[in-house]
């Protein structure tokens, strides 16, 4: 699989802080995405702070990460992203992203999102054989909040499985898609170096980021 080099998108400006929210399922590398963002910011000479907002990221449970990036470390006071202050949402899980807690962080005219449209059933719902995810309603809820032009949906889990043989790379694909759409104020060089420093499945993760 030969991946052509990506053109550098027009990166977003950082006014005070640039606020990212990463959602997903515990055990799928959500916390790793937050750590990669923070490390890449450091490598780019910027300030960064991240925190996990769902207690322990237990396997199979919903989790979300708040990450603030600033031009200088001293510009970051609080790490928690406040209501209507998310600049970008990296949505690794549709149900979590369309939940009221995450929607409250978004604002029409400010927030943009890339969301995995794959249907992942979490927690107690896995024990209910009749339960199905109202995907269309969840997609519409996000579009209603920030506008259809500000959100991109794709089944990144299936794409990851098809292209790289495992859905575990879906979250890094979503990060790559967000970066390619000008939603992450960090250089490609810093993000790739952060993936290398993380040291896990480096080649596959870089491919996933670039797809």
Model-identified regions with their sequence ranges:
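Active-site cofactor/cluster-binding pocket
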Residues: 1-23, 28-211
């Amino acid at each position: 699989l030969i991946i052509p080099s990506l053109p550098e998108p027009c990166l977003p400006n950082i006014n005070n802080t640039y606020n990212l929210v990463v959602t997903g399922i515990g055990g799928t590398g959500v916390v790793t995405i937050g750590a990669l963002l923070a490390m890449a910011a450091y490598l780019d000479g910027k300030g960064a702070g991240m925190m996990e907002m769902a207690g322990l990221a237990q396997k199979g449970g919903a989790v979300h990460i708040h990450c603030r990036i600033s031009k200088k470390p001293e510009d970051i006071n609080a790490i928690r992203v406040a209501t209507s202050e998310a600049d970008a949402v990296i949505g690794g899980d549709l149900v979590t992203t369309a939940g009221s807690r995450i929607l409250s962080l978004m604002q029409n005219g400010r927030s943009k999102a890339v969301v995995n449209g794959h249907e992942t059933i979490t927690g107690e719902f896995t024990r209910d054989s009749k339960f199905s995810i109202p995907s269309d309603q969840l997609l519409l809820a996000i579009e209603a909040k920030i506008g259809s032009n500000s959100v991109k949906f794709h089944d990144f889990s299936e794409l990851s499985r098809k292209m790289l043989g495992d859905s575990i790379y879906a979250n890094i694909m979503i990060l790559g898609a967000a970066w390619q759409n000008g939603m992450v104020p960090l250089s490609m060089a810093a993000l790739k170096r952060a993936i290398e420093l993380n040291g896990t499945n480096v080649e596959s993760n870089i491919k996933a980021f670039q797809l």
